[in-house]
Swiss-Prot record:
Residues 106-127, 177-183, 240-254, 280-289, 460-465, 524-554, 602-635, 659-673 are extracellular. Residues 203-207 are annotated as: Interaction with phosphatidylinositol 3,5-bisphosphate. Residues 255-279, 636-658 dip into the membrane without crossing it. The keyword Transmembrane helix applies. Residues 1-84, 149-155, 205-218, 311-436, 487-502, 576-580, 695-752 are cytoplasmic. It comes from Homo sapiens (Human). This is Two pore channel protein 2.
Length: 752
């Protein structure tokens, strides 16, 4: 094989290593020589460009090996099959917590009624777990090979991945050696790490939270000072020498000692027990209200909202930095692809002095890139518009701005009818006024259901006469079926199905029709006094309930018809789709606190004698207590119950009941756990989520944040995605910065 010749003009400021002998597969040259290895080098350049563009699309680092075999492995690793396998493995190892001891496989979490759960035999879940750990070990090995040992040593996430795997395998071995009777499983606490390390956005979010902690801590310190000062004021105020009944009740109930006083005011800070804590003193003297009002105004209205503002400002700033890194990765990936492809221009003597990318070469690359068909087609059309003109670096970068647009689905053309009557009918039933009529009919159906629910509120299901409601439902369902068929006639089947609202509407109409036919087949036609005996699995009342619930659900079809409501609904859907990273962080936090809660409080909530039924045995329990409110299902006896308990605590309504119960059942130290959970979930995470909801809505309603229609087209074909909230604020990386970073690539040498 002929040795490739190094050019005198290096692409990125000078040849690295002082020579032209580059390792095979790592060198890209301005002139591709003709010879036995020319085809292989050509394929290598194409594959390198494909990988770099895919890295840019996914905001991945390009500092990986770029020889032929490594790129083959790299593309297989990031293929849909491998990534879905890895995601399923992460889901599986997290899901094991529901099956492992203590198992959540019971119908209820209430300690009074819960039967002994099925416990898996030793080795069953452990076998699944070790398979998952082996998949993670393979994942780590592939990452370590592709990015190299030097990168592995500097990457804390990869080092943490290795430590977590080693600790998990050691702990797994200990479990088997103790026949699954170990008192503590450390590896269960470490499992959420696998979810974190697999998401770059979760890593960025976690880093931003860590950077924002000092500012959060400063406001938290103010809150602590505020709480301590008013605790001392309260203890002094309600511990006077001449106490009236109100003072004494207040002191004994809420300010008996320092821990109780702190807890009472902390709960009041969350407004969970307002005005309960104030009532004993306020009932005797209205002047005592001043103390509680001032405390609430300063703490809840000023400091807590100040904390929200600081979290919004600081976190948004740090998120900008992380997103700036993502933007730089995209620009660096596309620039690397440009440099690789521009090195192929001189093949065969064409454009010997030109610098740019041949459109036909880029088209060949785009054919191999893993990209959705809509974006790929749009980009290829733009590339073809250049003809044989070389693409400059700037034009190459602008081409990939198409990735920042979401495709608006174009509806198929309507069927063409020759008959004037059919054309008029098509115009009538395809008009949006016909949708308004359908919405009015759906509203009338909903009102009829509401009327009968009100009239029959005090009537037992077995004594209800469903004749009139049954007739009305039959009429409405026939109209829904007729409406669906007329829309199919006007729009065509493909045109009808191209509207998501029609798919939703049509699917529910078919389900309603099947359910109504089943009801009529089993219980015959409605008639006065229509109360037949139960036949089959469901009674007439059960089938009517299902029918009415589907009709109520179908009423959601009005949302697309109301512009403002449609904007709000689309923004909410965008949040669901684009806030997965924050949902993942919440899953991690819930998982860790649930496992800790199980280890701390499993079995501490025990039903007292006389509380095994719903008989009024709780009459002796204090009003508002855990026992009187029958909160027995809120416990940490298994993973599912722990998750629900943590959710109820995050809402902070009546969370003082949990604090008091676990203090009595397990000890006063339990308050530390619940206060930490309140800080992490209700203060930090909820405020972060609120900040991002605000940013999302502001972006959605800002007309400047959307792309204008393309020139020469009647309407915009694309629009900005909700995912790119901050793109207009981010700073584009400079030319020198990109070339400098490319010159530092550990596995790629580019020469001209």
């Amino acid at each position: 094989m002929a040795e490739p010749q190094a050019e005198s003009e290096p692409l990125l400021g000078g040849a690295r290593g002082g020579g032209g002998d580059w390792p095979a597969g790592l060198t890209t040259y301005r002139s591709i020589q003709v010879g036995p290895g020319a085809a292989a080098r050509w394929d290598l350049c194409i594959d390198q460009a494909v990988v770099f563009i895919e890295d840019a699309i996914q905001y991945r680092s390009i500092n990986h090996r770029v020889d032929a075999s490594s790129m083959w492995l790299y593309r297989r690793y990031y293929s849909n099959v491998c990534q879905r396998t890895l995601s399923f493995t992460i889901f599986l190892i997290l899901f094991l917590a529901f099956i492992e001891t203590p198992s959540s496989l019971t119908s209820t979490a209430d300690v009074r009624y819960r039967a002994a759960p099925w416990e898996p035999p030793c080795g069953l879940t452990e076998s699944v777990e070790v398979l998952c750990l082996l998949v993670f070990a393979a994942d780590l090995s592939v990452k370590g090979y592709l990015f190299g040992w030097a990168h592995f040593q500097k990457n804390l996430w990869l080092l943490g991945y290795l430590v977590v795997l080693v600790v998990s395998l050691v702990d797994w071995t200990v479990s088997l050696s103790l026949v699954c009777h170990e008192p503590l499983r450390i590896r269960r606490l470490l499992r959420p790490f696998f979810l974190l390390q697999n998401s770059s956005m979760m890593k960025k979010t976690l880093k931003c939270i860590r950077w924002s902690l000092p500012e959060m801590a400063s406001v938290g310190l103010l809150l602590a000072i505020h709480l301590c000062l008013f605790t001392m004021f309260g203890m002094l105020l309600f511990a006077g020498g001449k106490q009236d009944d109100g003072q004494d009740r207040e002191r004994l109930t809420y300010f008996q000692n320092l821990p109780e006083s702190l807890t009472s005011l902390l709960v009041l800070l969350t407004t969970a027990n307002n005005p309960d804590v104030m009532i004993p003193a306020y009932s005797k003297n209205r002047a005592y209200a001043i103390f509680f009002i001032v405390f609430t105004v300063i703490g809840s209205l000023f400091l807590m909202n100040l904390l929200t503002a600081i979290i919004y400002s600081q976190f948004r700033g740090y998120l900008m930095k992380s997103l700036q890194t993502s933007l730089f990765r995209r620009r660096l990936g596309t620039r690397a692809a440009f440099e690789v492809l521009s090195s192929m221009v001189g093949e065969g003597g064409a454009f010997p002095q030109a610098v740019g990318v041949k459109p036909q070469n880029l088209l060949q690359v785009l054919q191999k890139v893993q990209l959705d068909s809509s974006h790929k087609q749009a980009m290829m059309e733009k590339v073809r518009s250049y003809g044989s003109v070389l693409l400059s670096a700037e034009e190459f970068q602008k081409l990939f701005n198409e990735l920042d647009r979401s495709v608006v689905k174009e509806h198929p053309p309507r069927p063409e009818y020759q008959s004037p009557f059919l054309q008029s009918a098509q115009f009538l039933f395809g008009h949006y006024y016909f949708d308004y009529l359908g919405n009015l009919i759906a509203l009338a159906n909903l009102v009829s259901i509401c009327v009968f629910l009100v009239l029959d509120a005090d009537v037992l299901p077995a004594e209800r006469d469903d004749f009139i409601l049954g007739i009305l439902n039959c009429v409405f369902i026939v109209y829904y079926l007729l409406e669906m068929l007329l829309k199919v006639f006007a729009l065509g089947l493909r045109g009808y199905l191209s509207y998501p609202s029609n798919v939703f509407d049509g699917l529910l109409t078919v389900v309603l029709l099947v359910l109504e036919i089943s009801t009529l087949a089993v219980y015959r036609l409605p008639h006065p006094g229509w109360r037949p005996e139960m036949v089959g699995l469901l009674s007439l009342w059960d089938m009517t309930r299902m029918l009415n619930m589907l009709i109520v659900f179908r009423f959601l079809r009005i949302i697309p018809s109301m512009k403002l409501m449609a904007v709000v609904a689309s923004t909410v859907l965008g949040l669901v789709q684009n806030m997965r990273a924050f949902g993942g962080i919440l899953v991690v936090v819930y998982y860790v606190f649930a496992i800790i809660g199980i280890n701390l409080f499993r079995g501490v909530i025990v039903a007292l004698p006389g509380n095994s039924s719903l008989a009024p045995a709780n009459g002796s329990a204090p009003c508002g207590s855990f026992e009187q409110l029958e909160y027995w299902a809120n416990n940490f006896d298994d993973f599912a119950a722990a998750l629900v308990t943590l959710w109820n605590l995050m809402v902070v309504n009546n969370w003082q009941v949990f604090l008091d119960a676990y203090r009595r059942y397990s000890g006063p130290w339990s308050k530390i756990y619940f206060v930490l959970w309140w800080l992490v979930s209700s203060v930090i995470w909820v405020n972060l989520f609120l900040a991002l909801i605000l940013e999302n809505f502001l972006h959605k309603w800002d007309p400047r944040s959307h792309l204008q229609p393309l020139a020469g087209t009647p309407e915009a074909t694309y629009q900005m995605t909700v995912e790119l909230l901050f793109r207009d604020i981010l700073e584009e990386p400079g030319e020198d910065e990109l070339t400098e970073r490319l010159s530092q690539h550990p596995h790629l040498w580019l020469c001209r």
